[in-house]
Amino acid sequence: MFLKSEDIEGKLTHWISKDHAEKALNGEFEFAGGGLHSKPIGLWLSWNSGWEDWTSSEWPAWMERKICLQAKLKPGLKLWHIDTFEDFIRVWNEFKTFANIKEENTYMSMISLYDSKKKGIDFWDWLKEKKVDGVALTDEGQWATRMKTWLYGWDAACIVVFDPKNVELK
């Protein structure tokens, strides 16, 4: 359910526009406001070529405007590890607003995710309060949650780290 950053295995990359790469390498980040509540604001990393594989088949033109940076997580980070639907639902059901969501209606909980944000209750802020530093979605977890949850738009194995200072880019 949770992993330490030093237990993450495999290649981590961050794709960024050529115009912003130098700033990112110097630790300066600009994030646009989260358009989708299902995607938290943070530094998004491709894990084991998940994003590269997805974009090369689904959106090849996207990569033409980007460059690839190697990424390394700082040690000691606590990441919500989603490798199965059960990994997702255990944490999701701890969130007071959505307790006891059942598998068959999990996707509908996305509507509740939007509603709770309007009421000032934010799932991502709640995770941060629990000292969770980010989310690590495996390829298996992406497929297990894709049609059942609001993780549908995540598309590939990835890691999002809420505070970009916890990632070293090269």
Per-range role (PLM):
Residues 2-32, 36-37, 59-170:
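Active-site and NAD+-binding cores of ADP-ribose-processing enzymes
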Residues 43-66:
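Aromatic- and glycine-enriched beta-alpha-beta binding-site module
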